[in-house]
Swiss-Prot record:
Catalyzes the conversion of lactate to pyruvate. The gene is ldh. This is L-lactate dehydrogenase. The keyword Magnesium does not apply. Homotetramer. NAD(+) binds at residues 18, 39, 44, 69, 83-84, 105, 122-124, 147. Transmembrane segments: none annotated. It comes from Clostridium botulinum (strain 657 / Type Ba4). Its EC number is 1.1.1.27.
Amino acid sequence: MIKKRNTTKISVIGAGSVGATTAYALMLSGVATEIVLVDVNKAKTEGEAMDLSHGADFVQPVNILSGDYKDTESSDIVVITAGAAQKVGETRLQLINKNINIFKSIIPEVVKYNKDAILLVVSNPVDVLSYVTYKLSGFPKERVIGSGTVLDTSRLKHEIGKRYKIDPRNVNTYIMGEHGDSEIATWSVTNIQNIKIDEYANKENLEYNDNFRKEVYENVKNAAYEVINRKGATFYAIALAVTRIVKAILGDEKTILPVSTLVENYYGIKDVYLGMPCIVGGSGVEKALSIDLNKTEASKLVKSAETLKNTLNNASGL
């Protein structure tokens, strides 16, 4: 549990596009009194911290520093965005061997100075690297969280909201499983303000059929690739997703977010990190919710878990 104190310290490991934008989003949100940036590129990290600090007059009081692992000591949350960037045409799972080696150098240093912190993994492939972090850190599963499918779920809500011309915040649904190509959309539990999506579409004379579901799902699944093809990287939306998770932890909100957590017995899935609806609060993941899926969704989720397990088993350096 995050202890009540007058200051809140968040460290961000990795000051690339995702890390720096996450620090910016955290700064705007006002959730932290201190933000520490750490990266192998010292000059860039110093520049990012300076640039952010120059906006201090426009936000709630916050001290932004660049430093090394020692400077992260006693963080409430350590956000890990470091790793090789996903290239055009490269899947998240193809990044694994590069980033496992990076994490083997990062995690021991983070743990050395942050015995009580919650670790929030953002680097891709996030589910695999969350599991790697869990194993390397020795922390309880509740305190090792992946950003999971929080962003994918937002993308799904956006797609449905855009097509139905409604506020995406009124769409209740989840993307589950891998944050990547084997993720699943939980159409069977999707609703618009507690009205099942098929009933809502029928009542409002809107499209809802196999073609609709396929198009929406493909747009969500391929969203990152489309952004990367156009601008080289994704970082704004994931920074907002990370900030949402951080706020849930620091505020002990006990809100439900589809973060990546260790699954221990769900449709026979065990010992793998997956994006799952979880109650997120001051202790991190306080409970993973076992929502009822239909047979097709459950089968796809099992396959998603198998994909991640096979990737872990075939990865070098573990």
